[in-house]
A protein has these predicted regions:
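Pre-Walker A (pre-P-loop) alpha-helix and adjacent loop at the N terminus of AAA/AAA+ ATPase modules
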Residues: 1-29, 180-181
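Walker A/P-loop
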Residues: 21-56, 85, 152
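AAA+/P-loop NTPase substrate/partner-engagement loops
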Residues: 46-76, 83, 170-171
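Conserved nucleotide-sensing/catalytic segment adjacent to the nucleotide-binding pocket
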Residues: 72-104
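Helical "lid/switch" subdomain of P-loop NTPase nucleotide-binding domains
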Residues: 76-77, 92, 98, 107, ...
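AAA+/SF3 P-loop NTPase mechanochemical coupling elements
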Residues: 87-95, 126-144, 193
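Conserved C-terminal "switch" segment of AAA+ ATPases
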Residues: 88, 146-156, 160-196
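Conserved catalytic/switch belt of AAA+ P-loop NTPases
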Residues: 95-134
């Protein structure tokens, strides 16, 4: 985990020194439960930028991302435009969870293609709004369980940081220091009333 921390610290230092975002985002790859999303949120807090989250495992159609044309009765802006709206500015950390699920579009088009336009820093156009949002201030941080499922063009937009799974001993420490106290408090139990 020290190597992971070092890579992230190097990126943050680079951003703070140059006052510009790198041309690539961060891709945190590792097994479920290794804290990838929490690390992404921590980086956003350290950079003092607003953040928004996009969960690719729930995206079935590109129109969910890009919005639908106003010619349709049920037309609406896409999730990406809504995220910019909620953030209130175009300089933000865009946290893309489950990036490895982006290529599994079951509907109209490939969601990964839409992400490429967002990650190119050339601007993003929503089909409903029909206007381009500048993306120069967008810093993407993505998470994935299996980088083999991510296309080469998408991978080229990220610096990859691999997070190893926790050892059995580390899992015991995490459980006893963090999870167990929360469970005991929720159940109004004392530690001596519980056998672990």
């Amino acid at each position: 985990m020290e190597r992971v921390k070092q890579r992230i610290i190097e990126t943050i230092i680079q951003i703070n020194r140059t006052h510009t975002l790198p041309a690539y985002g961060l891709l945190l790859v590792g097994p479920a439960g290794t804290g990838k999303s929490q690390i992404a949120y921590a980086v956003a807090r350290i950079l003092k930028l607003p953040w928004t989250t996009l969960d690719m495992s729930s995206i079935n159609d590109t129109e969910q991302l890009t919005g639908s044309s106003r010619i349709y009765a049920n037309a609406k802006p896409g999730i990406i435009m809504e995220a910019f709206s909620v953030a209130g500015e175009s300089s933000l950390v865009f946290i893309i969870n489950e990036l490895d699920k982006a290529t599994n579009g079951k509907g109209n088009g490939n969601p990964a293609d839409v992400l490429l336009t967002l990650l190119d820093n050339l601007g993003f156009t929503d089909n409903y709004m029909e206007c381009m949002v500048p993306t120069v201030g967008v810093y993407p941080i993505a998470t994935a369980n299996d980088k083999a499922q991510i296309s080469a063009p998408l991978m080229s937009r990220f610096a990859v940081i691999e997070l190893p799974d926790y050892t059995a001993e580390e899992k015991k420490v995490i459980f006893s220091k963090f999870a167990l106290p929360k469970v005991l408090k929720r159940m109004s139990l004392k530690e001596e009333e519980c056998v672990v």
